């Protein structure tokens, strides 16, 4: 079923065994979240998944993992070419806050192959950059409050072209799972930008910080940015 396919794609993206608690927040569909354990059990009974570490973690066999990853690359590439987005919005192509070796593997096995496939279509990096930035602008104007991973996926692909983001306008966006390490962000417009699970080269100057009610339950942070996971930063 489509929901099981979505779960297989997520397991391919994580590239390591994950628990239900780790997998559930990734899903944008509330219905899929609610029935996640049932879908995982169904996949396991059909021998499409493996359980490890006392049955609490799920993954795929290497051959299936490679097949699903290739399917992900082909599907996302086609969506970016045609402008009809489904998988590109429902799944984060890279988990910015995961371990360094996993994140590097996601870049090598998912992000870079997508970029290479797109370059075959658009011929030059400049043409591809123009196409991707136009998609980001159109989406921001038409669907400013849309949920999903569309915007962070675009930023992660632009970041690994590599391209120059100086003076670009990313205002009024909500972005999670973006890797901005090693990028020159001088004069980039991040006004009214909601950062979530995003990593940077170095600390930011913070002009305004919004603390949710659960902040009172957190240990008093040494740093406003890094030590309270439930705190969101609004610039």
Regions found by a protein language model. Give the residues of each.
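LRR N-terminal entry segment and analogous cap-like coil->beta motifs
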Residues: 136-187
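Short beta-strand "wing" residues that participate in macromolecule-binding interfaces
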Residues: 50-51, 80
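Positions within the helices of HEAT/ARM-like alpha-solenoid repeats
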Residues: 18-19, 106-110, 146-150, 186
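WD40-repeat beta-propeller superdomains and closely related acidic/aromatic-rich repeat-like regions
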Residues: 175-235
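Leucine-rich, amphipathic alpha-helical/linker segments
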Residues: 62-66, 71-133
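Core register positions within helices of long alpha-helical scaffolds
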Residues: 39, 117, 154-160, 193
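Amphipathic alpha-helical scaffolds
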Residues: 2-45, 51-56
């Amino acid at each position: 079923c489509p929901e099981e396919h979505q779960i297989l794609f997520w397991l391919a993206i994580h590239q390591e065994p994950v628990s239900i608690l780790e997998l559930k927040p990734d899903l944008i569909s509330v219905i899929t979240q609610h029935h996640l354990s049932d879908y995982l059990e169904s996949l396991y009974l059909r021998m499409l998944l493996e359980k490890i570490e006392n049955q609490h973690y799920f993954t795929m066999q290497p051959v299936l993992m490679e097949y699903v990853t290739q399917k992900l690359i082909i599907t996302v590439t086609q969506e970016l070419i045609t402008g009809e987005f489904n998988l590109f919005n429902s799944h984060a192509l890279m988990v910015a806050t995961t371990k360094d070796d996993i994140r590097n593997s996601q870049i090598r096995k998912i992000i870079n192959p997508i970029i290479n496939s797109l370059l075959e279509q658009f011929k030059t990096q400049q043409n591809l950059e123009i196409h991707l930035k136009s998609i980001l602008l159109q989406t921001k104007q038409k669907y400013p409050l849309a949920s999903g991973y569309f915007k962070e996926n675009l930023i992660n692909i632009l970041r690994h072209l590599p391209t120059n983001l100086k003076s670009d306008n990313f205002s009024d966006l909500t972005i999670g799972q973006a890797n901005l390490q090693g990028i020159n962000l001088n004069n980039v417009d991040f006004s009214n930008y909601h950062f979530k699970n995003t990593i940077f080269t170095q600390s930011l100057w913070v002009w305004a910080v919004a603390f949710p009610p659960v902040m009172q339950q957190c240990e008093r942070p040494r740093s406003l940015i890094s030590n309270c996971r439930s705190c969101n930063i609004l610039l």
